[in-house]
Amino acid sequence: MSTAILVSLLRNGRCQVNRGALTLCFQKEHSCTTSTRHCFSANRRCFSSRFDLDGSGRPATWDSFGIWDNRIDEPIQLPPSIKYGKLIPHINLSKVGCSTQLGKRKENEDRFKLARLTPDILYFAVYDGHGGASAAEFCDRFMEDYIKEFLVEEHDMEKVLVKAFLEINKAFARHAHLSVDASLLTCGTTATVALLRDGIELVVASVGDSRALLCRRGKPFKLTIDHTPERKEEKLRIKKSGGFVTWNSLGQPNVNGRLAMTRSIGDLDLKSMGVIAEPETKRVKLQHTDDGFLVLTTDGINFIVNSQEICDIINQCHDPKEAAQVLTEQAIQYGTEDNSTAIVVPFGAWGKHKSSEVSFSFSRGFASSGRWD
């Protein structure tokens, strides 16, 4: 498809266009005389037209867009498509799947959030609190505001997220020291935040062990690495700061005998021991012909379901809402004791890499869990 088509539509005042409109424009620009470039089928809703979709030199068909021929029908964003030279589908927040399960805990300390921060930027986040839900609740309420504030003066989303994490930790510290609730000094939370600009520029920042992964061609592409004392550089920082690492009865390392992570928001009593709030970040340009979805998960899922299983479970589902629900319920069936939360964001190849039907067992041991995948 030529850029002229997209420019023409944009000049006519359209910022989004559905599949039918694009098909009509394509038909107008290209005659049907060249059989090698057009393939019509009577049993399909629309014709399939071959063109270089992603600049790779490989021809693609309309089927390459999973969302167009697989259960989710979203319009194309014209300005970003022209800017990046490839078709970029609109990400509708109402189609994003979210689910949280209590598990065997008395309280759900997980929080999740999704929002449109600007006309071009979407926000997705999961927070897994420990020692109470106060730190997770604080991030859930205020992280969005910090990010919005810093986006005004900074275009680089990685820098924005790093600054937002550090500032919200300072704000929580001020809040805790002014509170009469002493538990605020020892509670904390993980934070995994994803920003998506123009439907194609994805940036993820994280502290703790909540995860983000991209399903690309049916395989997991990890966007985060758990911050645990098992990581050599993390353990070294803890020791240099005067902290220490011990192992519990399950063989899991803990900072100063109490915290399973080396980075977090909160945990103010351990900040001087090397537990920092600075996130690690990852920047990715989406490939909508290959990328099926983004999923953010807390450790109630990650501890017991590995990354490939997460992709397989979601790829068997009809839509993201069902996928988030099934994933959190599967973690419960596997025997997780923790709260489990998932956000599933569909991309262009949703449904394209559908897994073969797999029967999942209702229980498993630590050896098969996702903590070590």
Curated annotation (Swiss-Prot):
Domain PPM-type phosphatase intervals: 95-347
Disulfide bonds: none
Cofactor(s) this protein requires: Mg(2+); Mn(2+)
UniProt subcellular location: Mitochondrion matrix
Keyword ATP-binding set for record: no
GO cellular component: mitochondrial matrix; mitochondrion
Superkingdom of source: Eukaryota
Annotated catalysed reactions: O-phospho-L-seryl-[protein] + H2O = L-seryl-[protein] + phosphate; O-phospho-L-threonyl-[protein] + H2O = L-threonyl-[protein] + phosphate
Binding positions (Mg(2+)): 128-129, 338
The keyword Metal-binding is annotated on this UniProt entry: yes
GO terms assigned for molecular function: metal ion binding; protein serine/threonine phosphatase activity
EC numbers for this chain: 3.1.3.16
Key words, A-Z: Hydrolase, Magnesium, Manganese, Metal-binding, Mitochondrion, Protein phosphatase, Transit peptide
Record note on cofactor: Binds 1 Mg(2+) or Mn(2+) ion per subunit.
Record GO biological process: regulation of intracellular signal transduction
PROSITE patterns found in the cross-reference section: PPM_1, PPM_2
Annotated family: Belongs to the PP2C family.
Protein name: Protein phosphatase 1K, mitochondrial
Species assigned in the record: Xenopus laevis
